[in-house]
């Protein structure tokens, strides 16, 4: 499957308010195809690519800052394992309240995982556009731009979000938000919930992109690691989809 189709699928699986924040892959491809070798064409491409990278970076930073604030404030539920255990214990007879606690945690975790996949697929998209540009023009933009993204752009530096994902998963495990021994019907019910469903679908798309990509080298991202959660890991695809 071509990368453009997988990107389209990833965009459709993202949150609605995120869908205009992805790399403008189709438009950038059109600009590359129209380059005739003139300085004006090259300048137009560089300007369009820079604007797209700025858009991606600003959105990632905005979301990361929001997640840090939510994580520190532990809202809408205090993400503290002891408090969470106590809340669930007190709500043992209130199924709706327990379900609400679980859903809030799963949603927060899912939004952060979606941001990690957003970072990955946009970096890959930028890399593929640069590769197409260099192939068409004989230029050498890919290496310096990839280096600049890795060193200076926020959307490639995912350590903070990854740490919060791991901490959230630890709370989920301790509080038995969705136990490993949960029945299949419980997993299926969770998968039908909006953000959780989108998260699983986005992870599967990213696995397809990573496993099937023919683009490997010093400018490639490291392999995507799925969150260490049995209930997400169980949704991994059995085989890769080839990327063109």
Swiss-Prot record:
Residues 1-147 form the SPX domain. It comes from the Eukaryota. Residues 212-244 are annotated as: Disordered. Coiled coil: none annotated. One of its GO terms (biological process) is cellular response to phosphate starvation. This is SPX domain-containing protein 6. It comes from Oryza sativa subsp. indica. The lineage of its organism: Eukaryota, Viridiplantae, Streptophyta, Embryophyta, Tracheophyta.
């Amino acid at each position: 499957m071509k990368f453009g189709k997988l990107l389209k699928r990833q965009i459709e699986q993202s949150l609605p308010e995120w869908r205009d924040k992805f790399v403008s892959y189709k438009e950038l491809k059109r600009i590359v195809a129209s380059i005739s070798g003139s300085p004006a064409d090259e300048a137009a491409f560089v300007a369009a690519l820079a604007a797209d990278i700025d858009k991606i970076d600003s959105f990632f930073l905005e979301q990361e800052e929001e997640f840090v604030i939510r994580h520190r404030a532990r809202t809408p539920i205090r993400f503290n394992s002891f408090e969470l255990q106590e809340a669930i214990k007190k709500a043992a007879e209130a199924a709706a309240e327990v379900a609400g606690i679980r859903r809030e945690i799963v949603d927060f975790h899912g939004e952060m995982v979606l941001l990690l996949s957003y970072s990955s697929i946009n970096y890959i998209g930028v890399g593929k556009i640069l590769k197409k540009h260099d192939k068409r023009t004989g230029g050498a933009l890919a290496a310096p731009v990839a280096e600049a993204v890795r060193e200076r752009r926020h959307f490639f530096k995912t350590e903070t979000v990854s740490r919060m994902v791991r901490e959230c998963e630890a709370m989920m495990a301790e509080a038995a938000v969705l136990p490993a021994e949960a029945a299949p019907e419980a997993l299926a019910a969770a998968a039908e919930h909006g953000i959780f469903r989108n998260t699983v679908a986005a992870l599967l798309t990213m696995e397809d992109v990573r496993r099937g990509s023919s683009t490997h080298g010093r400018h490639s991202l490291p392999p995507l690691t799925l969150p260490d959660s049995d209930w997400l890991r169980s949704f991994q695809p059995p085989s890769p989809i080839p990327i063109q």
